[in-house]
């Protein structure tokens, strides 16, 4: 066996090295300055400790703090330092798990007295002390017996349970930072000093061990960490901005919706919120109609036999709401379920009546109410609910039509997002997972088509980012995922396009081909908004409640300065309504500044102020939300201007094209 390995560097050069050489020694052999900046290295994309030997040939990269991959290491190491700090400050506290998550990390602790926000500054101070010590991260591999014995002797019962859960034959890695150690898969940076000081503990929360309500309640401390202070401060500023834009707060202030205990995870829509919801549905309905979709509606309650056939009963039963009818006055003892998805119902509509290849593609769309169980702790306003409306569509087509249909879907999705002001879009292709249905040949064909489509999208749209998510596809086929970036830089995964060869086969769906033989259609699942409720939540936060005029539930308030203008205000409001605008009249005996402030808090886009002079001259004083400017104009001019601005973008395009 050779003791040398062949390494290819990012510049394409290839060199031979001793297989026992460590990543740290490799970095130093390139340059001393690189060795000082190195925090880890990677071979064929797998990140390793600098202390690990090279071991095998491959493509090698030295990772520094500036590398995006270093951020996960920084956060991972900070979580370990958090755990050490807690155990130094609060002896007897048990540590459990501390993973890296999106935008940060957390660590769960078992302690008789839960931590509070007041504890965080003290813990942070201790963490900075530990980082200052600059202790090296060192790795040992222990036997299962040793690990269980050591953790048991320390009173770390949760760690013992974690050791028991590690599959036989898998290494049990222990990472030290000075004298403190933890069970961990790694990798880590070279020392605690490489973490830096750009971190912050954010909040505390309760969390059940392993997410099971039957297990003990732990205290979870959340934190975040970045490579530098600028990135940390930018993130904290974004969080402040996000708090101001929180759709739950704005929903209360704007009187859009509410939730209550008797209906956890389902929305009580108020008049203005429901108007906004209907605006979204009306817009989407027009877009679908112009793209050849047929709108349908399928039952919300269906016998479990249908869900067994579809596979949802086996794959998704724990997340479904079951319905049984019991009592002396009924002989119906069947089990039903509220639909969690619309797709099986659409297959039933496709199957109703004989279909020819000449009929394809058939595009069925539904604004379908679906219900999915979510743990109460996961519910979050409109963003995470149990009952919601899915803007589902399913295209039944031939395999030859699949690429063209995916491209048409993409054009529609991007156009919708652009109409709502989202310009930065990322599209990622999720490929076959380990557990899947269908032959490899079928997956090869489907993935090949979607890769071709993705490349065409990339060539046509310069501002669209694309990528691949290996192994992240649905069990029945590959899919595209569409992610939006909002006004404050957050990303939201919304639209999907999924190819499905499985469901038509399960239900025996077919069409008659050109050769007069039965053939199975390809089924393309497509969602643009996804959950309409969630999409509205995203819009509210993106616009900070200041919705575009065409989408606002109340577009104009006509407010009087004195009662002398009441009749004129009523006349003006009537004309505005006749022109198709959503108008409210405010004739209250209040000061005009009070009225303007109140309606501004309600995020009404336009306020038309009418006083005695305006009544005499048939004018209005226009004030825009967020602006101190005032503009005087005739009522007719105001109506013309507002009607143009209040025209939805799809209708405006038709008007301009005509």
UniProtKB/Swiss-Prot annotation:
Q: Which Gene3D superfamilies match?
A: 3.10.20.30, 3.30.54.20, Anticodon-binding domain (3.40.50.800), Bira Bifunctional Protein, Domain 2 (3.30.930.10), Threonyl-trna Synthetase, Chain A, domain 2 (3.30.980.10)
Q: Which InterPro entries match?
A: aa-tRNA-synt_IIb, aa-tRNA-synth_II, aa-tRNA-synth_II/BPL/LPL, Anticodon-bd, Anticodon-bd_dom_sf, Beta-grasp_dom_sf, TGS, TGS-like
Matching entries from Pfam families are given as: HGTP_anticodon (PF03129), TGS (PF02824), tRNA-synt_2b (PF00587), tRNA_SAD (PF07973)
Annotated ranges, domain TGS = 1-64
Transmembrane segment boundaries = none
One GO biological process term: threonyl-tRNA aminoacylation
GO MF term list: ATP binding; metal ion binding; threonine-tRNA ligase activity; tRNA binding
Compartment annotation: Cytoplasm
* Annotated binding of Zn(2+), by residue: 343, 394, 525
Q: Report whether Repeat shows up as a keyword of the record.
A: no
Instruction: Summarize subunit and interaction data from the UniProt record for this chain.
Output: Homodimer.
What is this protein's record name?
Threonine--tRNA ligase
Q: What is the lineage of its organism?
A: Bacteria, Pseudomonadati, Pseudomonadota, Alphaproteobacteria, Hyphomicrobiales
């Amino acid at each position: 066996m050779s003791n040398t390995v062949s390494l290819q560097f990012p510049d394409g050069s290839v060199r031979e090295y001793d297989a026992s050489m460590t990543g740290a020694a490799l970095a130093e052999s390139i340059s001393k300055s690189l060795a000082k900046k190195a925090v880890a290295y990677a071979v064929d994309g797998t990140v390793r400790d600098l202390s690990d030997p090279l071991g095998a040939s491959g493509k090698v990269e030295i990772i520094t703090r500036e590398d995006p991959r270093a951020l996960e290491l920084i956060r991972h190491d900070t979580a370990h330092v958090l755990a050490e700090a807690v155990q130094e400050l609060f002896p007897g506290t048990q540590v459990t798990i501390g993973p890296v998550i999106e935008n940060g990390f957390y660590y769960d602790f078992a302690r008789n007295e839960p931590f509070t926000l007041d504890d965080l500054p003290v813990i942070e101070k201790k963490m900075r002390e530990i980082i200052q010590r600059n202790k090296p991260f060192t790795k040992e591999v222990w036997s299962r017996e040793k690990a269980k014995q050591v953790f048991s002797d320390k009173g770390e019962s949760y760690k013992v349970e974690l050791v028991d859960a590690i599959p036989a034959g898998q290494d049990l890695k222990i990472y030290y930072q000075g004298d403190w150690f933890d069970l961990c898969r790694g990798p880590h940076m070279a020392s605690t000093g490489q973490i830096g000081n750009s971190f912050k503990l954010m909040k505390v929360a309760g969390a059940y061990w392993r997410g099971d309500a039957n297990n003990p309640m732990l205290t979870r401390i959340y934190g975040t960490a970045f490579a530098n202070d600028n990135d940390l401060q930018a993130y904290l500023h974004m969080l402040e901005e996000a708090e101001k834009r929180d759709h739950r707060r704005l929903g209360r202030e704007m009187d859009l919706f509410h939730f209550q205990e008797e209906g956890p995870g389902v929305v009580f829509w108020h008049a203005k919120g429901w108007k906004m919801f209907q605006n979204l549905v009306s817009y989407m309905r027009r877009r679908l109609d112009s793209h050849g979709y047929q709108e349908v509606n399928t039952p919300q309650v269906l016998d479990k036999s249908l869900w067994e056939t579809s596979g949802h009963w086996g794959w998704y039963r724990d997340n479904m709401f079951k319905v049984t009818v019991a009592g002396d006055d009924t002989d119906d003892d069947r089990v039903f379920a509220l639909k969690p998805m619309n797709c099986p119902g659409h297959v039933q509509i496709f199957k109703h009546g004989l279909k020819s290849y000449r009929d394809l593609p058939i595009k069925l769309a539904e604004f379908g109410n679906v219900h999915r169980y979510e743990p109460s702790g996961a519910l979050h306003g409109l963003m995470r609910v149990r009952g919601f409306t899915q803007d589902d569509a399913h295209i039944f087509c031939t395999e030859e039509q699949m690429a063209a249909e995916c491209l048409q879907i993409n054009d529609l999705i991007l156009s919708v997002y652009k109409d709502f002001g989202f310009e930065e879009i990322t599209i990622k292709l999720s490929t076959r997972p380990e557990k899947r249905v269908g032959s490899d040949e079928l997956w090869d064909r489907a993935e090949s088509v979607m890769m071709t489509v993705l490349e065409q999208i990339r060539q046509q749209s310069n501002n669209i980012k694309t990528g691949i998510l290996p192994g992240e596809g649905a069990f029945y086929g590959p899919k595209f995922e569409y992610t939006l970036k909002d006004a404050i830089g957050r990303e939201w995964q919304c639209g999907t396009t999924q190819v499905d060869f499985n469901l038509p086969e399960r239900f025996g769906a077919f069409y008659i081909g050109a050769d007069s033989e039965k053939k199975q259609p390809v089924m393309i699942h497509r969602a643009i908004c996804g959950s309409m409720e969630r999409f509205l939540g995203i819009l509210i936060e993106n616009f900070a409640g200041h919705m575009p005029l065409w989408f606002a539930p109340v577009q104009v308030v006509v407010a009087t300065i004195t009662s002398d203008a009441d009749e004129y205000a009523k006349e003006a409001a009537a004309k505005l309504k006749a022109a198709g605008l959503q108008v409210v009249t405010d004739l209250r005996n209040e000061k005009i500044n009070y009225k303007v402030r109140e309606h501004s808090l309600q995020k009404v886009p336009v306020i038309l102020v009418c006083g005695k002079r305006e009544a005499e001259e048939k004018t209005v004083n226009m004030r825009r939300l967020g602006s101190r400017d005032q503009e005087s104009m005739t009522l007719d001019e105001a109506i013309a201007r507002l009607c143009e601005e209040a025209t939805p973008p799809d209708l405006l395009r038709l008007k301009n094209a005509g």
